Amino acid sequence: MQDSLTLQPIALVDGTVNLPGSKSVSNRALLLAALAEGTTRLTNLLDSDDVRHMLDALKAIGVKYSLSADRTCCEIVGQGGPLNAKEPLELFLGNAGTAMRPLAAALCIGNGDVVLTGEPRMKERPIGHLVDALRQGGAEVEYLEQENYPPLRVKGGFSGGEVTVNGSVSSQFLTALLMAAPLAPNDTRIVIKGDLVSKPYIDITLKLMATFGVVVENNDYDTFHISGQQQYQATREYLVEGDASSASYFLAAAAIKGGTVKVTGIGRNSMQGDIHFADVLEKMGASVEWGDDYIACTRGDLNAVDLDMNHIPDAAMTIATTALFAQGTTVMRNIYNWRVKETDRLTAMATELRKVGAEVEEGHDFISITPPAKIVFAEIGTYNDHRMAMCFSLVALSSSPVTILDPKCTAKTFPDYFEQLARLSHLA
């Protein structure tokens, strides 16, 4: 019997949420701290499945760290160079793309014989474009099951040079190469093939690398030049900013049924592209207030939008359920990379939106959503995808309850999401 959670209709949301740390920032910072010279103290680290997978992998490789009781503060003793596995290892990385891709590249610099594997869904998430680029740089990588997909066996060997990487499927492939390249014996020139998706995530990578003392020459996101034989330097204390993708659910709830909801831990200067989700809510008719360390959203009469959402792929999912409460047909374009995430999010989203009564057209890289006259009760399948569960919680802002199957899947990035939502909610 699958776990489920039924949310009763919510009349009003109001209050403040202190956001958990960003997943994207947490896992990048952990890896860079592990590669750096010196000890780094990370605060507001996200405690979630994806981050635990990264921590477990680093420990297995021999990285020493200590965690606070609540797992949000981590002191990491850097290796001062590549990760070298002393004996053959198998690392289980769950469904954490932010651990699988960067670790695969980082382990191509060191010595060792490491197998990287994960949950069944991880074995369906493409990694061929990254492996192709690593092999061009001399890395020894083999596929253990299906060509172009994990599990992988990695045996080091990446020495730099010119490598071409396809940027059109996932920006994580480029992120992985960028973070590993400074430790290679030679300079690396990365050439991007195709249109680079999710550019703001590359900005997160470059900003974090700079925090740890390494600067990359970025030529308009077409080519990147990284000097070899560099060393990351520990940063004594680093505060992980709040997760902007996680903020999207609370800001959207306020736009639909506020009151006002204020999220803290991110603000106008945040490095995460997903803060621009708030701009979309504003275009739809909500009012948004920006502070240095907060974003606040207040209800407005919402109208449909037709937008390219390539720059905010994760937060854009939240617009799909917000569209249920907007006048007119909302169209979200240039979101092909939804298909290679935790599940095929385009198909999953279309399927579940139809259950609550919406009229949906699903294209190769777009979705259009016309809300029903009245939202109907449904049991929502979540496809072991944390964002499906959180997005569809917004259905409870209607006059109908909603049942979320497998609600615990939010543990991937936000274990206490439903408790936080309940804290802000006044039931009808």
Swiss-Prot record:
<dbReference type="InterPro" id="IPR013792">
    <property type="entry name" value="RNA3'P_cycl/enolpyr_Trfase_a/b"/>
</dbReference>
<comment type="similarity">
    <text>Belongs to the EPSP synthase family.</text>
</comment>
<dbReference type="InterPro" id="IPR006264">
    <property type="entry name" value="EPSP_synthase"/>
</dbReference>
<comment type="subunit">
    <text>Monomer.</text>
</comment>
<keyword id="KW-0963">Cytoplasm</keyword>
<feature type="binding site">
    <location>
        <position position="412"/>
    </location>
    <ligand>
        <name>phosphoenolpyruvate</name>
    </ligand>
</feature>
<feature type="binding site">
    <location>
        <position position="172"/>
    </location>
    <ligand>
        <name>3-phosphoshikimate</name>
    </ligand>
</feature>
<keyword id="KW-0028">Amino-acid biosynthesis</keyword>
<feature type="binding site">
    <location>
        <position position="387"/>
    </location>
    <ligand>
        <name>phosphoenolpyruvate</name>
    </ligand>
</feature>
<feature type="binding site">
    <location>
        <position position="341"/>
    </location>
    <ligand>
        <name>3-phosphoshikimate</name>
    </ligand>
</feature>
<feature type="binding site">
    <location>
        <position position="125"/>
    </location>
    <ligand>
        <name>phosphoenolpyruvate</name>
    </ligand>
</feature>
<dbReference type="GO" id="GO:0009423">
    <property type="term" value="P:chorismate biosynthetic process"/>
</dbReference>
<feature type="binding site">
    <location>
        <position position="97"/>
    </location>
    <ligand>
        <name>phosphoenolpyruvate</name>
    </ligand>
</feature>
<dbReference type="GO" id="GO:0005737">
    <property type="term" value="C:cytoplasm"/>
</dbReference>
<feature type="binding site">
    <location>
        <position position="198"/>
    </location>
    <ligand>
        <name>3-phosphoshikimate</name>
    </ligand>
</feature>
<feature type="binding site">
    <location>
        <position position="23"/>
    </location>
    <ligand>
        <name>phosphoenolpyruvate</name>
    </ligand>
</feature>
<feature type="binding site">
    <location>
        <position position="172"/>
    </location>
    <ligand>
        <name>phosphoenolpyruvate</name>
    </ligand>
</feature>
<feature type="binding site">
    <location>
        <position position="345"/>
    </location>
    <ligand>
        <name>phosphoenolpyruvate</name>
    </ligand>
</feature>
<dbReference type="GO" id="GO:0009073">
    <property type="term" value="P:aromatic amino acid family biosynthetic process"/>
</dbReference>
<dbReference type="GO" id="GO:0003866">
    <property type="term" value="F:3-phosphoshikimate 1-carboxyvinyltransferase activity"/>
</dbReference>
<feature type="binding site">
    <location>
        <position position="171"/>
    </location>
    <ligand>
        <name>3-phosphoshikimate</name>
    </ligand>
</feature>
<feature type="active site" description="Proton acceptor">
    <location>
        <position position="314"/>
    </location>
</feature>
<feature type="binding site">
    <location>
        <position position="23"/>
    </location>
    <ligand>
        <name>3-phosphoshikimate</name>
    </ligand>
</feature>
<dbReference type="InterPro" id="IPR023193">
    <property type="entry name" value="EPSP_synthase_CS"/>
</dbReference>
<protein>
    <recommendedName>
        <fullName>3-phosphoshikimate 1-carboxyvinyltransferase</fullName>
        <ecNumber>2.5.1.19</ecNumber>
    </recommendedName>
</protein>
<keyword id="KW-0808">Transferase</keyword>
<dbReference type="InterPro" id="IPR001986">
    <property type="entry name" value="Enolpyruvate_Tfrase_dom"/>
</dbReference>
<dbReference type="InterPro" id="IPR036968">
    <property type="entry name" value="Enolpyruvate_Tfrase_sf"/>
</dbReference>
<feature type="binding site">
    <location>
        <position position="314"/>
    </location>
    <ligand>
        <name>3-phosphoshikimate</name>
    </ligand>
</feature>
<feature type="binding site">
    <location>
        <position position="28"/>
    </location>
    <ligand>
        <name>3-phosphoshikimate</name>
    </ligand>
</feature>
<comment type="function">
    <text>Catalyzes the transfer of the enolpyruvyl moiety of phosphoenolpyruvate (PEP) to the 5-hydroxyl of shikimate-3-phosphate (S3P) to produce enolpyruvyl shikimate-3-phosphate and inorganic phosphate.</text>
</comment>
<dbReference type="GO" id="GO:0008652">
    <property type="term" value="P:amino acid biosynthetic process"/>
</dbReference>
<comment type="pathway">
    <text>Metabolic intermediate biosynthesis; chorismate biosynthesis; chorismate from D-erythrose 4-phosphate and phosphoenolpyruvate: step 6/7.</text>
</comment>
<keyword id="KW-0057">Aromatic amino acid biosynthesis</keyword>
<feature type="binding site">
    <location>
        <position position="24"/>
    </location>
    <ligand>
        <name>3-phosphoshikimate</name>
    </ligand>
</feature>
<feature type="binding site">
    <location>
        <position position="170"/>
    </location>
    <ligand>
        <name>3-phosphoshikimate</name>
    </ligand>
</feature>
<dbReference type="Pfam" id="PF00275">
    <property type="entry name" value="EPSP_synthase"/>
</dbReference>
<feature type="binding site">
    <location>
        <position position="337"/>
    </location>
    <ligand>
        <name>3-phosphoshikimate</name>
    </ligand>
</feature>
